[in-house]
Amino acid sequence: AVAWVDKWPDWPSPALVLVGPPGCGKTHLGQVWQKRAGASVFEPGGAVIREPIETPVFVDSPNDPAHDEEIFHLYNSIAASGKHLLVATEVPPVRWNGRLPDLKSRLSAAPHISIEAPNETLIAAVMMKMFADQQIDVGAEVISYLVNRMERSFEAARLLVDRLNNASLATKRRITVPLAREVIQTPPEEDKEI
């Protein structure tokens, strides 16, 4: 997926579609591309689409069929202007049911890049980096404990690292397996009770 984003602006089509489960990094990758490309972010129901389109556009999670016509016109304007559209979605457009057929067919014809949920090794490495970025030393046994008990997504990793950091600061304890166990067993809304 990163290689395709790096190929911009030499995409073979006006659009590129990133497909993957929640928390797999689609939005993050789209935001990286947005900054690199100087792209706008599509806001459903936002400003009227002006032609010619002056910047590439990032559409994140186009899940509401009520915005299909707006996205369809955006796609056509992008294609006519020689710009690009990056779409991040959980379901490939070919499997969109009850959606605007013209939008579905155009996005189905665009190149699709699948991003899978991260595996244990990647989640462990990401969590180690997240802790290191906050200058927190956490042992491998803590990371192993967490990875085996958490949802496999970057967002879940970020939230868990934040919760552990907050619990560590609140209790003045190092982040260890016992503290990790307490945090995992405590619903997020009850974190202050740890």
Question: Which ranges hold each PLM region?
Answer:
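Post-Walker A helix-loop "phosphate-sensing" segment adjacent to the P-loop in P-loop NTPases
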Residues: 34-45
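C-terminal helical "lid" of AAA+/P-loop NTPase domains
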Residues: 144-148, 155-169
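Conserved AAA+ ATPase "SRH/arginine-finger" region at the nucleotide-binding site
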Residues: 110-122
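Short regulatory helix/loop adjacent to the ATP-binding pocket of P-loop NTPases
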Residues: 93-108
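Conserved nucleotide-sensing/catalytic segment adjacent to the nucleotide-binding pocket
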Residues: 50-89
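Conserved C-terminal helix/linker of AAA+ ATPases
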Residues: 168-185
